[in-house]
């Protein structure tokens, strides 16, 4: 029994590590997307997923994995890819039209939506303590992001919120697919291939020539996205959303650090308050879930 408990705790810690790593690379991806400038949104999503597809294909070849869709998980893979791509498009659309803080906040609703979708699709019900911790982290995110909806376009704000919802749904279908034995690298490969094929014809309708710098930025976004996708897919295969999704908020901290180093941005007092709230919530969730695992 003690050995089983230890194994369960190890899986939880692995999920946390992979999710935090994913958050870091998603923060890098957003930085590259922003630095790519006035490239059309669909064009950005194409190059982001096109380069990610190369990395995902390499993982498929290394593991000698067939590209044939696994039986029993086809619906989950299609839904993960469709929801995931919709989330990427809506998120990029929001980033291009809202302040980065507004767009980031709306996208960070995805873990909250993941728990809601997990309740219906996976029958994983969070208890009152876990709900309270997640809401506390969300409040901390508000301190950090300080959204100014007064100056935001209503359509872009709705798009950003829907993007977070789509991302939350996608992560839930990741859990369903990997729970049926689908490997994490196959999930990433299928998503990248699906997104590239969907984006290509749409991109041709409004293609804009890019500079070398813009091209390099989008290559960076694709590589960062691929690494982040591998990590987040693996994270949700180790543990349910209700136990680890809180750590996705660490992306806010990484974004602030990257902003300081790359853009010379210094967080204000409210941001530091938010950091403290988020880190405290993450620590409480970690201790609470570990205690539950031992019981």
Can you say where each PLM-predicted feature lies in the sequence?
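Structural signature of hydrophobic alpha-helical transmembrane segments
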Residues: 41-52, 93-110, 153-166, 211-225, ...
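Juxtamembrane C-cap of transmembrane helices in multi-pass membrane transport proteins
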Residues: 25-39, 44, 89-100, 106, ...
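Hydrophobic transmembrane alpha-helices of multi-pass small-molecule transport proteins
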Residues: 129-146, 270-289
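Hydrophobic/small/kink-forming positions within alpha-helical transmembrane segments
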Residues: 23-27, 57, 81, 85-89, ...
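Helix-helix packing/entry segments at the starts of transmembrane helices
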Residues: 104-109, 180-193, 229-260
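C-terminal transmembrane-helix exit sites in multi-pass transporters
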Residues: 93, 110-132, 253-272
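Membrane-interface interhelical linkers
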Residues: 1-24, 53-79, 128, 152, ...
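Glycine-/small-residue-enriched transmembrane alpha-helix faces in small-molecule transporters
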Residues: 2-43, 151-176, 295
């Amino acid at each position: 029994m003690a050995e089983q408990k230890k194994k369960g705790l190890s899986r939880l810690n692995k999920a946390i590590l992979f999710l935090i790593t994913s958050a870091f690379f998603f923060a890098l991806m957003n930085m590259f997307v922003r630095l790519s400038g006035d490239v059309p949104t669909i064009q950005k999503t194409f190059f982001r997923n096109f380069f990610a597809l190369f990395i995902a294909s390499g993982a498929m070849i290394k593991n000698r994995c067939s590209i044939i869709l696994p039986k029993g998980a086809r619906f989950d893979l299609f839904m993960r890819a469709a929801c995931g791509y919709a989330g990427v498009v809506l998120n990029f659309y929001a980033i291009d039209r809202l302040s980065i803080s507004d767009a980031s906040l709306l996208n960070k609703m995805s873990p909250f939506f993941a728990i809601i979708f997990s309740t219906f699709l996976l029958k994983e019900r969070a208890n009152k303590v876990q709900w309270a911790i997640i809401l506390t982290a969300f409040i901390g995110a508000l301190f950090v992001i300080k959204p100014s909806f007064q100056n935001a376009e209503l359509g872009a704000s709705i798009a950003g919120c829907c993007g977070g919802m789509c991302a939350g749904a996608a992560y839930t279908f990741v859990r369903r697919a990997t729970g049926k034995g689908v490997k994490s690298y196959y999930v990433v490969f299928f998503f990248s291939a699906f997104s590239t094929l969907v984006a290509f014809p749409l991109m041709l309708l409004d293609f804009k020539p890019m500079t070398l710098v813009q091209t390099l930025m989008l290559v960076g976004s694709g590589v960062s996205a691929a690494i982040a996708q591998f990590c987040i897919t693996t994270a949700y295969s180790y543990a349910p959303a209700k136990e680890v999704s809180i750590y996705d908020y660490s992306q806010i901290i990484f974004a602030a650090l990257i902003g300081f180093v790359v853009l010379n941005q210094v967080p204000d007092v409210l941001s530091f308050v938010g950091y403290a709230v988020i880190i405290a919530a993450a620590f409480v969730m970690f201790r609470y879930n570990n205690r539950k695992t031992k019981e």
